[in-house]
Amino acid sequence: MATTAGPEVGSDTALKERVLSTPEVLAQSVANMAPSAAMALLPLFVFFSAGNALWLSFGLGLVVMLLVGYCAAQFGKRINSAGSFYVWVTRGLGPGAGHAAGWGLVLGYLFTGIACVLGFEIYGDQFLVGLGLSPGNHAVRAILYVVGGLTPALVSVLDIRISQRAAFILEAISVTIILVLCIAVFVHNGGVFDHAQLTLKGFKPGGLVVGMVLAIFAFVGFESAGALGQEAKDPERSVPRAILWSCAAVGVFYLVVSYAQLDGFGAAGFAKASAPLPQLADHVGLGPLSHFIAIGITFSMFACALACLNAGSRMLLSFAHDGLAPKALAH
């Protein structure tokens, strides 16, 4: 039987109870993972360690995170709370471990959100330069910082359903653009078979382990659907499903995109790439698509910043109810 976490999710808060559908809860985890942004550079870093075992690194990372997700899903079935891992770990391991987990997540959401605002400016500026704007325009960069920092906060405050739908739409657009590029790579190469990758040419176990650890970073945030336990219509089902489905679906996306990048460039070309996705579009003869990739990654950064605000604010709400944060945050 599911339970609430206790006083930290009382009805006197501003949270709307039982309003989010399963897709809207799922959008939280997917947006927080920022799959399009993750694929912008992370596969290159994994490649430097794992080589042609790049796709296998992401595959093993997926397996590990599915196991972690299964454990989180069991808590999500039983405890509906805005505090997610803070409450779950407290129930399982005690207050000390719970506080450490909670504050760790809050700091993670904070720094990830800041990184997303920076990424929003970088890729937004890249998109505008591609349209003909002069590079290094400080006024435009300042506007992008303001838009990337304030707009997610405004959307987050307005309504959780609007917030989740916006995150879902933006991430869906960016993922679709990158999948179009992957299809173009396979068509350009005459198929999906890459002998070097599928035979793990030059494979080294040590490099694979390091690559797997790096790949796991791409899954950070998939647990954040747990923070919507109070607001989900059917939290006992939607929260566990969102955690597991987001991990599985985005993990498959990572496998496809990382494989396609190395397939498109080849090992030598990939090692020299500085901006793999836009350069890959040029490589397969779809130069104009690079502009759409830039705006897609910009959307992904925005959606991730929004998801960090949603999850982090609910974590602080739980802290406030437990006396770990100012009481003003409890309403």
Regions found by a protein language model. Give the residues of each.
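Membrane-interface "cap" regions at the ends of multi-pass membrane proteins
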Residues: 1-43, 47-53, 65-70, 195-196
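Helix-loop-helix connectors at the membrane interface of multi-pass transporters/channels
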Residues: 6, 87-90, 117-143, 177, ...
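Helix-loop-helix junctions that connect adjacent transmembrane segments
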Residues: 11-15, 55, 132-141, 169-295
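Membrane-water interface regions at transmembrane-helix termini and the short interhelical loops
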Residues: 16, 75-78, 100, 147-173, ...
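Select transmembrane alpha-helical segments in multipass membrane proteins
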Residues: 19-29, 94-107, 145-148, 202-215, ...
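Extracellular loop-to-transmembrane helix junctions
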Residues: 35-135, 140, 144, 246-249, ...
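Transmembrane alpha-helical segments of multi-pass small-molecule transport proteins
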Residues: 59-60, 128-160, 175-182
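Membrane-helix boundary/coupling elements in multi-pass transport proteins
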Residues: 81, 104-119, 219, 224-232, ...
